[in-house]
Amino acid sequence: MSFDRLAPHYRWLERLLAGEVLQQARVAHLAALDQAENILLVGEGPGRFLQALRARQPAVPITVIDASTKMLEVARAVGSGPTTFIQADLIRDPLPTSEWDAIVTHCFLDCFAPLSLTQVIEKLARGATPRATWLITDFGLPPSGWRRQRARLAHALMYRTFRIATRLEAKQWADPSANLIENGFQLATRRAFSHGLIQADHWQRG
């Protein structure tokens, strides 16, 4: 899986396909990080959330991990303050030793098939403090009706496209909720966007 080819074009592609909806979802729970002292962003992509976070918290230490070297270059160009950028694949590579009291995985967990998803969440959870916050923006699947059918069609199109463009591992969306609960996190708040196609979650441990 590699987003290197998409990195230079990701921002305008996102705006073309989703407008500002994804960014609105990313920052929906930004205030939940106001007390964080050591923040980990995984799969940050081109750095739009990093910019918003830095505008609110210019001095907090932030670590950005991405498997894509090109995405890290784009994010680094907009990053400021005490920010560490690390190129790593969380399936193959060890997680840097630290204790994060906030983890952010926007548009990241939905890239993984169920087995890999379990491994990634367990690895990240081991690096989190006992009272850590975890923010997640990903696909969602409404419970019923036309919204659910619309989401299924959108998922199928997006996964097919990204599997071709990036060799994405996942073939369909896998709900991470059970894995998060198993690792001590509970859902604090969820906001739905685009009729439930996208959901922004605030999970809390402890």
What is each PLM-predicted segment?
Residues 1-21:
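Class I SAM-dependent methyltransferase Rossmann-like catalytic core
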Residues 19-36:
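Conserved alpha-helix/loop element of class I SAM-dependent methyltransferases that forms part
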Residues 40-41, 45-92:
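Class I SAM-dependent methyltransferase SAM/SAH-binding core
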Residues 95-103:
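A short acidic, Gly/Pro-enriched loop at the edge of an enzyme's catalytic core
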Residues 118-130:
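A short glycine-rich, Lys/Arg-flanked "PGG" loop and its adjoining helix->strand segment in the class I
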Residues 137-183, 190:
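C-terminal alpha-helical "lid/dimerization" subdomain adjacent to the S-adenosyl-L-methionine
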